[in-house]
A protein has these predicted regions:
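Midchain, well-structured core segments that form catalytic/ion-binding scaffolds
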Residues: 1-88, 94, 107-117
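Surface-exposed helix-capping loop/turn segments at secondary-structure junctions
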Residues: 8-12, 66-70, 101-102, 166-174
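Sequence-level detector for tyrosine residue identity
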Residues: 35, 59, 64, 78, ...
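Charged catalytic carboxylate motif
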Residues: 54, 89, 153, 157
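Short, flexible segments with low predicted structural confidence
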Residues: 90-92, 129-130
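Zn-dependent metallopeptidase/amidohydrolase metal-coordination segment
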Residues: 103-201
Length: 201
């Protein structure tokens, strides 16, 4: 699997993470059962599928090599986020708050995983972040450094954006929904889960 990484394309941003959950019950003995969890992250569903196929072949080959058996239990992970630029109504709201901002670009790839990725395949989602803190996200040194910037301005931004979306009988909100082209609807999303995350022997 280490050598397999050489086949990944840079633009796919593939990441593999292995965790050995069980490796036998006694020392100095070949285990009767070993359990490993492999996590795949990538920039698209296609890249995840292609990587998963390579991983499956690697495990199949290793299992065949020592005459063992393999049982797979696919686990559902987050789907990659589809980039969507800031709507004019949000930009208008930021400017009313006299705040500075930078619009993200598709090239600003973030390897973090979030359930927002699933939502972007179904709805017009705008994922934004804000300041007012220091340290590593989810880290022991994370701390709030500016309460106005961390709490108050984001709340005002959301309230103003909602107002701008709903004014004039929700004209802007309806326009965004009308122009959005989802990857899945509810039924096809559920079918994707069933097709890709059922047990395989």
């Amino acid at each position: 699997m280490g050598l397999m990484r050489e086949t990944f394309r840079e633009e796919d941003h593939v990441r593999l993470h292995n965790v050995i959950r069980k490796a036998g019950d006694v020392i100095n003995s070949v285990p009767d059962e070993a359990v490993i969890e492999t996590k795949v992250r990538a920039a698209s569903l296609e890249a995840i599928r292609a990587t998963q196929e390579k991983i499956d072949r690697a495990y199949d080959g290793a299992t065949y090599a020592f005459g063992g058996k393999i049982k797979r239990e696919p686990l559902k992970g987050y789907i990659p986020v589809i980039h969507r630029g800031a709507d004019e109504v949000m930009k208008e709201s930021v400017e009313l708050l006299d705040a500075t901002y930078r619009c993200s670009r598709p090239s600003d790839f973030n390897n973090a995983c979030t359930d927002v990725g699933d939502l972007t395949h179904l709805f017009p989602v705008l994922n934004f972040t804000f300041g007012g803190f220091a340290g590593k996200l989810h880290g022991a040194d994370f701390r709030i450094t500016d309460e106005e910037l961390a709490y108050i301005k984001p709340a005002k931004l959301l309230a103003l954006t909602i107002y701008h979306l709903l004014r004039d009988q929700a004209k802007e909100a309806k326009k965004i929904c009308r122009e959005f082209k989802p990857v899945f609807n509810k039924e096809s999303y559920c079918q994707y889960i069933r097709d890709n995350f059922s047990e395989n022997e």
